[in-house]
Amino acid sequence: MNNSMINPSIVDLLTKVGDRYSLVILTSKRAREIIEGAEPLIKVDSHKPLTIAINEVNEDIVKYEE
């Protein structure tokens, strides 16, 4: 297995959000909230805000609203 693979995959995330632009906006805004002190909504092994945000999207905890 290639250790550089992103998990969850971009393809999986796009099925939840719709397009790459919305995915970037959603995850970056959520990561910024975490950086500014918001508590993560899921428990993950990573302390990186963007990784946490991506996993929250993958678990359908954070959703994109138009």
From Swiss-Prot:
InterPro entries: DNA-dir_RNA_pol_omega, Pol_omega/Rpo6/RPB6, RPB6/omega-like_sf
Keyword presence, Transferase: yes
Entry EC no(s): 2.7.7.6
Catalytic activity: RNA(n) + a ribonucleoside 5'-triphosphate = RNA(n+1) + diphosphate
Biological process terms in GO annotation: DNA-templated transcription
Class in the EC hierarchy, top level: transferase
GO cellular component, one term: DNA-directed RNA polymerase complex
Gene Ontology MF terms in the entry: DNA binding; DNA-directed RNA polymerase activity
Domain of life per record: Bacteria
Pfam families for this protein: RNA_pol_Rpb6
Keywords: DNA-directed RNA polymerase, Nucleotidyltransferase, Transcription, Transferase
Function noted in UniProt: Promotes RNA polymerase assembly. Latches the N- and C-terminal regions of the beta' subunit thereby facilitating its interaction with the beta and alpha subunits.
HAMAP family per the UniProt record, alphabetical: RNApol_bact_RpoZ (MF_00366)
Recorded family membership: Belongs to the RNA polymerase subunit omega family.
Subunit record text: The RNAP catalytic core consists of 2 alpha, 1 beta, 1 beta' and 1 omega subunit. When a sigma factor is associated with the core the holoenzyme is formed, which can initiate transcription.
Name the record gives this protein: DNA-directed RNA polymerase subunit omega
Species this protein is from: Clostridium botulinum (strain Alaska E43 / Type E3)
